[in-house]
Amino acid sequence: MNSLRIARAALRVRPTAVRAPLQRRGYAEAVADKIKLSLSLPHQAIYKSQDVVQVNIPAVSGEMGVLANHVPSIEQLKPGLVEVIEESGSNKQYFLSGGFAVVQPGSKLSINAVEGYALEDFSAEAVRAQIAEAQKIVSGGGSQQDIAEAQVELEVLESLQAVLK
């Protein structure tokens, strides 16, 4: 019962406290137009808290562009293209097989992925050949485990093929 009285006392507002002027933040302050990107794979860090202008990610909820001062969120990534627009204006593209992106307050973006490679490292012909192999296994050429693994492989390869076109 004692704690209830303390809570009620905390709700009472003294008239002098209400009359105190509120300080407002001015809009003349410079707004940061960069986002600090960390893009990490198990074997390397591609970006280590580097300033970039924009990052486009393939979230499960839909394609998403992340700019400075973006709303904080956590996104699961599907296999697809991550596009990084750097300060110099250059555009770097990476294919990730999946992972997570965390947009944090203070214009910070952390992307963690199991696999990721520069898009230029892929061969469209090799991807087509691997898709054909995976399709053979999915259509009944192996155990249930082999078929399940081939289905996952096929999903990733088809996403990669769509990006390479």
Curated annotation (Swiss-Prot):
Q: Which family does it belong to?
A: Belongs to the ATPase epsilon chain family.
One GO CC annotation: mitochondrial inner membrane
The residue span given for the transit peptide is 1-27
Keyword Mitochondrion annotated: yes
Question: What task does this protein carry out?
Answer: Mitochondrial membrane ATP synthase (F(1)F(0) ATP synthase or Complex V) produces ATP from ADP in the presence of a proton gradient across the membrane which is generated by electron transport complexes of the respiratory chain. F-type ATPases consist of two structural domains, F(1) - containing the extramembraneous catalytic core, and F(0) - containing the membrane proton channel, linked together by a central stalk and a peripheral stalk. During catalysis, ATP turnover in the catalytic domain of F(1) is coupled via a rotary mechanism of the central stalk subunits to proton translocation.
Q: Where in the cell is it found?
A: Mitochondrion; Mitochondrion inner membrane
Question: Which InterPro entries does this chain map to?
Answer: ATP_synth_F1_dsu/esu, ATP_synth_F1_dsu/esu_N, ATPD_C_fung, ATPsynth_dsu/esu_N
Write down the species.
Answer: Neurospora crassa (strain ATCC 24698 / 74-OR23-1A / CBS 708.71 / DSM 1257 / FGSC 987)
* N-terminal signal peptide: none
UniProt keywords (A-Z) are: ATP synthesis, CF(1), Hydrogen ion transport, Ion transport, Membrane, Mitochondrion, Mitochondrion inner membrane, Transit peptide, Transport
The main location is mitochondrion
Q: Which GO terms describe its biological process?
A: proton motive force-driven ATP synthesis
MF terms from GO for this chain are:
ATP hydrolysis activity; proton-transporting ATP synthase activity, rotational mechanism
**Subunit structure comment from the entry:** F-type ATPases have 2 components, CF(1) - the catalytic core - and CF(0) - the membrane proton channel. CF(1) has five subunits: alpha(3), beta(3), gamma(1), delta(1), epsilon(1). CF(0) has three main subunits: a, b and c.
The lineage's top-level taxon is Eukaryota
**Protein name, please?**
ATP synthase subunit delta, mitochondrial
